[in-house]
């Protein structure tokens, strides 16, 4: 049996941004559900953080969630099992009040949500579904983890040693990987960066949400219960783009022939590496703005930038997060204190990046 795994969808992200809603809608309309139809996949497991806001959901986002995700599930006669993540819960110490219970707990759809650890069978294969672990369910969750006969675990977990973002710090909180060593396969949501360490797989979010996601591959996975393998299906759509401008290496013809349509409704950083001909730059910016990007930031940088390794270019020439981390590194405090300060800075920075102002 093949199961589509998706996680950290964060409907209503970027403060219920319509641009973000339109962007993620393309993923479901063009990539996710067409793939499921083509491969005749009739089971989805969502590994948590279906919605973004913990405290409330506005009417527009609720409708977008239904029209974009729930409705195609129902119309495609697909079964969906939704694991509750920390963004889905109203309180931090209990999962009892959560988005899926309040929105779809009384619906007639073939949709189930899991706010407690549960073992389900999929075509003869037992899988432990493990929602966000908090103080009220910790003991029960750990008991099931220790005693279950299931060899596969899907959850929304915070596990030490994994990175939430590609440019972030390794998590030092939460459970140790050894807690899950008895399972053959562990798949988790929560951290948006895809990574694997031994038997544990963080699946990552299906699309970009902040500048930290730039050039970090996004998509969803298909799990084969018979072979116990994961297949990654890439999402080609990007919300964040960078243009490195160097008119010593590009001509006016290059600028005029460039396809700017990919920048519509997106965030764009124009990094000026070398500017010798202002007219060429003006034409590039004119064409860029005509494509109706959502936001454009121009960074005047005179450092040597290796265009062959664009992923090494920071958010800015030296972005805010890098500057703050370097400052903390030079403070006369212990390494542990530096880690805690950097972790808090990372958290605040990514919260700010996810806001739509």
Mark where each language-model region is.
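Accessory, non-catalytic peripheral segments of nucleic-acid enzymes
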Residues: 225-357
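A conserved active-site cap/scaffold subdomain adjacent to cofactor or substrate pockets
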Residues: 189-239, 243-246
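A structural signal for the main folded, soluble domain(s) of proteins
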Residues: 1-2, 29, 35-37, 136, ...
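Short beta->alpha connector loops
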Residues: 131-137, 206, 249, 276
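His/Asp/Glu-rich metal-coordinating catalytic cores
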Residues: 43, 50, 55-200
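Alpha-helix termination/capping residues and helix-transition junctions
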Residues: 38, 147, 180, 262-264
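Conserved beta-strand elements of the Class I
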Residues: 4, 126-128, 221, 268
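N-terminal active-site segment of His-dependent metallophosphoesterases
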Residues: 1-64, 141, 145-149, 342, ...
């Amino acid at each position: 049996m093949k199961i589509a795994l998706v996680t950290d969808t964060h409907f209503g992200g970027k403060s219920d941004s319509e641009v973000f809603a339109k962007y993620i809608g393309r993923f479901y309309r063009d990539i996710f559900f067409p793939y499921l139809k083509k491969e005749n996949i009739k089971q989805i497991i969502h590994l948590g953080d279906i919605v973004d806001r913990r405290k409330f959901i506005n009417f527009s986002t609720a409708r977008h969630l239904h029209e974009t995700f729930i409705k195609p599930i129902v119309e495609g006669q697909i079964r969906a099992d939704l694991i509750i993540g920390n963004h889905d819960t109203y309180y931090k110490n209990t999962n009892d009040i959560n988005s899926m219970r309040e929105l779809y707990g009384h619906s007639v759809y073939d949709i189930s949500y899991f706010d407690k650890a549960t073992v389900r069978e999929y075509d003869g294969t037992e899988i432990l579904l493990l929602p966000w672990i908090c103080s009220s369910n910790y003991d029960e969750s750990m008991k099931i983890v220790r005693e279950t006969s299931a060899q596969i675990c899907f959850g929304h977990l915070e596990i030490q040693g994994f990175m939430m973002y590609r440019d972030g710090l390794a998590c030092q909180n939460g459970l140790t990987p050894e807690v899950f060593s008895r399972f053959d396969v562990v798949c988790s949501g929560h951290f948006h960066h895809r990574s694997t360490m031994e038997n544990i797989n963080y699946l990552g979010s299906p699309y970009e949400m902040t500048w930290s996601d730039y050039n970090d591959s996004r998509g969803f996975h298909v799990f084969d219960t018979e072979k116990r393998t994961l297949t990654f299906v890439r999402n080609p759509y990007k919300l964040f783009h960078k243009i490195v401008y160097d008119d010593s290496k590009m001509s006016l013809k290059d600028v005029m022939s460039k396809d700017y349509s990919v920048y519509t409704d997106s965030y764009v950083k124009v990094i000026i590496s070398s500017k010798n001909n202002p007219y060429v730059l003006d034409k590039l910016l004119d064409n860029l703005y005509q494509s109706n990007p959502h936001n454009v930031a121009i960074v005047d940088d005179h450092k040597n930038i290796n265009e062959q390794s664009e992923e090494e270019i920071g958010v800015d020439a030296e972005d805010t997060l890098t500057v703050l981390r370097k400052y903390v590194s030079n403070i006369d405090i212990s390494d542990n204190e530096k880690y805690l300060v950097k972790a808090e800075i990372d958290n605040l920075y990514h919260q700010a990046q996810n806001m739509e102002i």
